[in-house]
Amino acid sequence: MKSIRILFTLTMSVLLGLTSCEETTEAGEFDNWKERNTLYINSIAAEARANTYGDWKIFLAEGLDTAKVWGNENYVYCHVVKSGNGTEHPLFTDSVVINYNGRLMPSKTYPDGYKFDSSYKGELNPSFNVPVTLLLNETVKGFYTAVQHMVDGDVWKVYIPSLLGYGEGGTTGVPGYSTLIFDINLVSFHRPKK
Protein backbone atom coordinates (compact mmCIF):
# COMPACT_ATOMS: atom_id res chain seq x y z
CA MET A 1 0.00 0.00 0.00
CA LYS A 2 2.85 2.31 0.88
CA SER A 3 4.52 1.66 -2.50
CA ILE A 4 1.26 2.46 -4.34
CA ARG A 5 1.03 5.78 -2.49
CA ILE A 6 4.66 6.59 -3.37
CA LEU A 7 4.11 5.59 -7.00
CA PHE A 8 0.94 7.73 -7.16
CA THR A 9 2.76 10.74 -5.62
CA LEU A 10 5.68 10.37 -8.06
CA THR A 11 3.33 10.04 -11.05
CA MET A 12 1.37 13.14 -10.05
CA SER A 13 4.58 15.11 -9.48
CA VAL A 14 5.89 14.18 -12.92
CA LEU A 15 2.57 15.06 -14.58
CA LEU A 16 2.38 18.41 -12.79
CA GLY A 17 6.00 19.11 -13.71
CA LEU A 18 5.37 18.35 -17.37
CA THR A 19 2.25 20.50 -17.40
CA SER A 20 4.07 23.49 -15.91
CA CYS A 21 6.88 23.10 -18.46
CA GLU A 22 4.47 23.27 -21.38
CA GLU A 23 5.55 25.95 -23.82
CA THR A 24 3.25 28.83 -24.46
CA THR A 25 3.99 30.81 -27.55
CA GLU A 26 2.42 34.21 -27.71
CA ALA A 27 2.66 36.21 -30.89
CA GLY A 28 5.16 39.05 -30.66
CA GLU A 29 4.22 42.64 -31.33
CA PHE A 30 6.01 42.67 -34.67
CA ASP A 31 5.61 39.03 -35.81
CA ASN A 32 4.58 38.87 -39.50
CA TRP A 33 4.86 42.67 -39.50
CA LYS A 34 5.30 43.03 -43.26
CA GLU A 35 2.29 40.84 -44.07
CA ARG A 36 0.10 42.44 -41.38
CA ASN A 37 0.94 45.92 -42.66
CA THR A 38 0.18 44.89 -46.24
CA LEU A 39 -3.22 43.56 -45.17
CA TYR A 40 -3.84 46.71 -43.13
CA ILE A 41 -3.06 49.17 -45.93
CA ASN A 42 -5.12 47.05 -48.35
CA SER A 43 -8.11 47.31 -45.98
CA ILE A 44 -7.64 51.09 -45.72
CA ALA A 45 -7.38 51.31 -49.54
CA ALA A 46 -10.65 49.37 -49.92
CA GLU A 47 -12.42 51.65 -47.43
CA ALA A 48 -11.05 54.77 -49.14
CA ARG A 49 -12.04 53.53 -52.59
CA ALA A 50 -15.58 52.74 -51.37
CA ASN A 51 -15.72 56.34 -50.02
CA THR A 52 -19.16 55.69 -48.58
CA TYR A 53 -19.51 59.13 -46.99
CA GLY A 54 -17.40 61.13 -49.44
CA ASP A 55 -14.76 61.93 -46.83
CA TRP A 56 -11.75 60.14 -48.38
CA LYS A 57 -9.13 61.41 -50.81
CA ILE A 58 -6.61 59.18 -52.59
CA PHE A 59 -3.39 60.53 -54.09
CA LEU A 60 -0.80 58.79 -56.23
CA ALA A 61 2.66 59.33 -54.76
CA GLU A 62 4.36 62.48 -55.96
CA GLY A 63 6.43 61.88 -59.08
CA LEU A 64 4.71 58.70 -60.32
CA ASP A 65 3.24 58.54 -63.82
CA THR A 66 -0.55 58.83 -63.59
CA ALA A 67 -0.94 56.98 -66.91
CA LYS A 68 0.32 53.73 -65.38
CA VAL A 69 -1.51 51.33 -63.10
CA TRP A 70 -0.06 51.23 -59.60
CA GLY A 71 -0.67 49.03 -56.56
CA ASN A 72 -2.10 50.13 -53.21
CA GLU A 73 1.41 50.75 -51.86
CA ASN A 74 1.89 53.67 -54.28
CA TYR A 75 -1.00 55.76 -52.99
CA VAL A 76 -1.63 57.87 -49.91
CA TYR A 77 -5.09 57.51 -48.33
CA CYS A 78 -6.47 60.60 -46.60
CA HIS A 79 -9.55 60.65 -44.41
CA VAL A 80 -10.82 64.23 -44.20
CA VAL A 81 -11.69 65.00 -40.57
CA LYS A 82 -12.25 68.73 -41.10
CA SER A 83 -12.03 70.88 -44.21
CA GLY A 84 -10.13 74.14 -43.94
CA ASN A 85 -10.89 77.47 -45.54
CA GLY A 86 -7.62 78.02 -47.40
CA THR A 87 -7.51 78.30 -51.17
CA GLU A 88 -3.88 77.46 -51.99
CA HIS A 89 -1.82 74.33 -51.51
CA PRO A 90 1.78 74.13 -50.28
CA LEU A 91 4.52 73.23 -52.74
CA PHE A 92 7.33 70.71 -52.21
CA THR A 93 9.79 73.55 -51.51
CA ASP A 94 7.58 75.32 -48.94
CA SER A 95 7.84 75.23 -45.18
CA VAL A 96 4.64 74.18 -43.45
CA VAL A 97 3.29 75.14 -40.04
CA ILE A 98 1.46 72.08 -38.73
CA ASN A 99 0.26 70.03 -35.81
CA TYR A 100 0.90 66.33 -36.37
CA ASN A 101 0.87 62.97 -34.62
CA GLY A 102 2.53 59.88 -36.15
CA ARG A 103 1.54 56.33 -35.21
CA LEU A 104 1.96 52.77 -36.45
CA MET A 105 -0.99 50.55 -37.28
CA PRO A 106 -3.07 49.31 -34.32
CA SER A 107 -1.78 46.25 -32.46
CA LYS A 108 -2.60 44.21 -29.37
CA THR A 109 -0.40 46.34 -27.11
CA TYR A 110 -1.23 49.63 -28.84
CA PRO A 111 -4.89 49.56 -29.97
CA ASP A 112 -4.60 53.12 -31.32
CA GLY A 113 -1.18 52.42 -32.83
CA TYR A 114 2.24 53.03 -31.29
CA LYS A 115 3.01 56.78 -31.30
CA PHE A 116 6.50 57.31 -32.74
CA ASP A 117 6.41 61.09 -33.25
CA SER A 118 4.18 64.03 -32.39
CA SER A 119 4.25 67.80 -32.26
CA TYR A 120 1.73 67.90 -29.40
CA LYS A 121 0.68 65.98 -26.29
CA GLY A 122 -2.78 64.53 -25.80
CA GLU A 123 -5.52 65.11 -28.35
CA LEU A 124 -5.31 67.37 -31.39
CA ASN A 125 -6.80 70.74 -30.55
CA PRO A 126 -5.80 73.34 -33.16
CA SER A 127 -6.86 76.22 -30.91
CA PHE A 128 -4.64 74.95 -28.09
CA ASN A 129 -1.68 73.10 -29.68
CA VAL A 130 1.46 75.03 -30.61
CA PRO A 131 2.31 74.07 -34.22
CA VAL A 132 5.79 73.31 -35.53
CA THR A 133 7.42 74.42 -38.76
CA LEU A 134 8.82 71.76 -41.11
CA LEU A 135 10.46 71.91 -44.50
CA LEU A 136 8.10 69.81 -46.58
CA ASN A 137 10.92 68.42 -48.73
CA GLU A 138 12.55 66.92 -45.61
CA THR A 139 9.62 64.64 -44.81
CA VAL A 140 8.85 61.15 -46.18
CA LYS A 141 7.27 60.90 -49.63
CA GLY A 142 3.81 59.93 -48.40
CA PHE A 143 3.73 62.83 -45.94
CA TYR A 144 4.68 65.50 -48.47
CA THR A 145 2.38 63.98 -51.09
CA ALA A 146 -0.61 64.38 -48.75
CA VAL A 147 0.30 67.81 -47.38
CA GLN A 148 0.68 69.26 -50.89
CA HIS A 149 -3.06 68.60 -51.37
CA MET A 150 -4.13 70.26 -48.12
CA VAL A 151 -5.21 73.86 -47.53
CA ASP A 152 -4.92 76.00 -44.39
CA GLY A 153 -7.19 74.68 -41.66
CA ASP A 154 -7.50 71.13 -43.01
CA VAL A 155 -7.38 68.27 -40.51
CA TRP A 156 -6.72 64.89 -42.12
CA LYS A 157 -5.88 61.37 -40.98
CA VAL A 158 -3.29 60.21 -43.51
CA TYR A 159 -2.42 56.54 -44.12
CA ILE A 160 0.99 56.03 -45.72
CA PRO A 161 2.13 52.61 -47.01
CA SER A 162 5.64 51.60 -45.96
CA LEU A 163 6.97 52.12 -49.50
CA LEU A 164 6.14 55.84 -49.17
CA GLY A 165 7.28 56.01 -45.54
CA TYR A 166 10.45 54.50 -44.10
CA GLY A 167 10.45 51.43 -46.37
CA GLU A 168 11.96 48.09 -45.49
CA GLY A 169 14.72 49.60 -43.35
CA GLY A 170 12.55 51.59 -40.95
CA THR A 171 14.02 54.25 -38.67
CA THR A 172 14.34 54.84 -34.93
CA GLY A 173 11.07 53.73 -33.32
CA VAL A 174 9.61 52.54 -36.64
CA PRO A 175 10.24 48.95 -37.80
CA GLY A 176 10.71 48.25 -41.50
CA TYR A 177 7.57 47.71 -43.58
CA SER A 178 5.46 49.92 -41.28
CA THR A 179 2.31 51.66 -42.43
CA LEU A 180 2.39 55.20 -41.02
CA ILE A 181 -0.72 56.96 -39.76
CA PHE A 182 -0.55 60.72 -39.31
CA ASP A 183 -3.12 63.09 -37.86
CA ILE A 184 -2.23 66.35 -39.62
CA ASN A 185 -3.58 69.86 -39.15
CA LEU A 186 -2.16 72.31 -41.69
CA VAL A 187 -2.11 75.73 -40.02
CA SER A 188 -0.27 77.64 -42.77
CA PHE A 189 2.69 77.48 -45.14
CA HIS A 190 5.41 79.80 -46.38
CA ARG A 191 7.07 80.04 -49.78
CA PRO A 192 10.82 80.61 -49.91
CA LYS A 193 11.81 84.06 -51.11
CA LYS A 194 13.21 84.18 -54.62
Report the location of each language-model feature.
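Cross-family detector of peptidyl-prolyl cis-trans isomerase
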Residues: 2-5, 21-194
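C-terminal motif of bacterial Sec signal peptides marking the signal peptidase cleavage site
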Residues: 16-20
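Sec-dependent N-terminal signal peptides
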Residues: 4-15
